[in-house]
């Protein structure tokens, strides 16, 4: 057991004590932070590692290391992440129920690790539970383990404070007065992407910031709003292809691999043959006859295990390999963005999409999403869209529900997994959720999409809405009750940094254009959204010179595992 101001490192031996079967085991490392001015849980997961397949009698040494700073808690009064003074007990086991104390880390002074600002003020402050006056959990022998634990002093002054610099409203890009710029000009270094964007009209940028569909009609139910790949969820625009060489990209849903229509028919002109009812087509493709001169196509994709099952493996190498499988098929079907992984917290077992999400633990969720993303983004020009950002923890009234969450709970539970995924994998995109948090639609939340994701975590890709977020869907989903909250708006999506609105509709474009005209939407903000979308598009597999998206970033590690 070792620890300093930078890392906590645990080395454990795993042995198969059976005499018949080979097997694997997981080593889990927890920490118990001291109660100072902030109450703490009994223990929190700090790191984990999975052994190789061990034969009877075989053993393996596993070393697990995680940043000391990751044990910090969020202090709402200080608007900062803090390591409070006291003793941090490190516990090791193969589950949260079997941990034993391995060491005691002593921090003499409270340290602010990150100084930021509160972003999620409560609109209806919940009554928080307290453990004051409650006998703390313990087990036989715990006191003796603490007394005998290895004592390690951590240097308080060696831990430096990071101060977040928050961005301001972007200024309009300086106008490029030269000839009309193209993607080739940007790629060759003749001009910058900002130069190109400065030449775009408001109408062009409003189109760039929307998908190519005309609203969320029946086809939206089956995620089939793409004009390019049957069954794919949607496309970015090709309006800039003819004169600027900027291709469109295709987005396909998940979660168990690529969700495409496995069987479809086109006529002699290359148009899909349809019964006229998209829902009927989705379930009765085999009944559609092939017309004279037509062609029958098959595009079957591999079904990988769903997220909840993958997380139960505790095997990040396995999850990365599953991402690699999806990445190879994205290349085959020319899909640029996989609308997965979903990584919301398992808050309630009644959530209808829990199978799509990894865990109730934010570290597990974040590491799984990062492993999946790294597997996919090891392929050139493709990426993931981690979702649903954030606090999408129920399906009932998911479009209009308002989640009341404290600042600390938001950061330590509901955002922590997304933060880990961004810092350790840099997903190409993030998908915002339908719901509100503390009275603000997540799709319209500048504090969530820009201040947290970009300013605090360094997210570099673009943010998209979930399908139909900025449309009025109360009639489409036949809600029978009065809605307290309306839907998010296109103008506020752009203001928040929600760059791409999907699946796109004319009303979204018109609202953006009108808002720039009346001065309620700064031109620089629209240009910035268009820039972020095109920056990703120009790195997509639509171009022969594309590279693995993640290669350009200096990625962190939430947990480092080595085996011997």
What is the predicted role of each segment?
Residues 1-73, 82-96, 116, 120-564:
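Glycoside hydrolase catalytic-domain context in secreted enzymes
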